[in-house]
Amino acid sequence: SLVGSEMCIRDSIKAEIPAKAAILLGQHIGAPAKPIVAKGDVVKVGTKIAEPGGFVSAAIHSSVSGKVAKIDTIVDASGYAKPAIFIDVEGDEWEESIDRSETLVKECSLTSEEIVKKIADAGIVGLGGACFPTQVKLCPPPAFKAECVIINAVECEPYLTADHQLMLEHAEEIMVGVSILMKAVKVNKAFIGIENNKPDAIQLMTKVASSYAGIEVVPLKVQYPQGGEKQLIDAVISRQVAAGALPISTGAVVQNVGTAFAVYQAVQKNKPLFERVITVTGKSLAKPSNFLARIGTPMKQLIEACGGLPEDTGKIIGCLL
């Protein structure tokens, strides 16, 4: 089977904070962010270190506390040299504005415009892989009207279980995030699409959704590439995106389930996007795991936390398909 999810541990582990972090300025689709710190500046966890570089761009925040070592290029996973902010880590001091408690905050009194601004300030981007700046997606062109929000919790990519794990651990927070997204685009209906190979997530999310107005969990047959935006819209609301048209032309605003959780954290907890759950897996690893990892953590560190690579490892790759 290509699914491979049986290899992953059913809990997410907090990855160790790196000794040095390299935070890319172009983590998202669109213009790279512009640095607002310089060598020698002291930063905390959650400090804004770069502003959006254009309309389609995203703010970047420090995932660590310490001192800016340099702003230089680093070779990214695609093999290209990209600008990044390098930080020497000292301690783990967070910005005081971030609510670090685990208390669930359900009520949101902000207006749609205030929600979108808070999401933009927090640097939230789509966490399904494309990293499209979320605030842009929540402000469609005037010619289009949103009718519903669709949450992509399909995770059809073989071996990945990060979204699955997130739903099992943070179903309530995700549901509040979905409600906030609904308010942001002024709709009263949301659908959460989950494939049938995650029955525990479907059961839990359905139970939690029952106490939130207008949110419906939609079980879907297991089919690749159902996690694609256009395919998901068709599967959930039976509307096709015409060739060359935007997905919003169907009335749907699609967001990843990880993005919904990040929106909850940004709007309700004042927490910018500086960490995410990531799956590190494969038959070469002694202990495949899901990690809650700070952005800028070297992949080598996560691989070593899984037991390291044997000498006969063929390749280290991203998604299979």
Located regions from the model:
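Short, small-residue-biased leader/transition segments that mark boundaries at the very start
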Residues: 2-9
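Acidic, glycine-anchored pre-beta loop/turn
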Residues: 7, 37-43, 75
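Short beta-strand-turn/beta-hairpin segments enriched in glycine/proline and small hydrophobics
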Residues: 11-30, 51, 60-62
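Short, well-structured beta-strand-loop connectors
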Residues: 38-51, 70
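Conserved hydrophobic positions within beta-strands
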Residues: 66-68
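Acidic low-complexity segments
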Residues: 75-132, 143, 199, 212, ...
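Gly-rich Lys/Arg/Thr-decorated short loops/hinges at beta-loop-alpha junctions or inter-strand turns
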Residues: 95-97, 149-163, 284
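Hydrophobic alpha-helical positions that pack around
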Residues: 188-299, 305-312, 320
